[in-house]
């Protein structure tokens, strides 16, 4: 999976909103066409409103991906961003089932999973319920240090991955 996150740019930095969407769609389709040739997915990551000025929630992503309609582009969700943007993470995952191709996990404080207050039991139960078969990757800060973050992430994955 090739992940497109902040690389997509911001509407506020474009000439106009129309130009932004036109350019984003054109380039995503170009990437996805190439990805299809290589049997790879393009995952469009939803990023919270404090870091990106568009495509923040699962619903934003689903709406845009349905409009775009490319078979090699799917939805990439990240628990850290979902904690900020989604009123109901379980419902958002359920609604995203058809397009969800990649998941990042980090806790509410962006540390390794289990450090903050995220309900990962519910997240992994929901992923099981929607028959999600894609990858789950830890994307967390190396805090308090890389060794601790790494070992705690492995412990977390051993608990939830089966």
Regions found by a protein language model. Name each.
Residues 1-74:
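Active-site acidic/histidine proton-transfer and metal-coordination neighborhood
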Residues 30, 55-77, 81-162:
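Histidine-acidic metal/acid-base catalytic patches
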């Amino acid at each position: 999976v090739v992940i497109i996150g902040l690389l997509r740019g911001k509407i506020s930095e474009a000439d106009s909103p129309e130009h932004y969407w036109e350019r984003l769609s054109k380039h995503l389709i170009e990437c996805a066409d190439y990805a299809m040739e290589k049997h790879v997915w393009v995952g469009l990551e939803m990023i919270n409103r404090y870091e990106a000025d568009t495509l923040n929630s699962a619903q934003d992503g689903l709406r845009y991906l349905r409009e775009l309609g490319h078979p090699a582009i799917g939805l990439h969700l990240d628990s850290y961003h979902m904690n900020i943007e989604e009123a109901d993470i379980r419902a958002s995952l359920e609604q995203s089932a058809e397009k969800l191709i990649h998941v990042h996990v980090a806790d509410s404080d962006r540390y390794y999973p289990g450090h903050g207050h995220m309900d990962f039991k519910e997240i992994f139960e929901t992923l099981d319920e929607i028959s999600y078969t894609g990858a789950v990757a830890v994307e967390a800060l190396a805090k308090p240090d890389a060794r601790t973050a790494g070992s705690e992430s492995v412990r977390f994955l051993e608990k939830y991955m089966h």
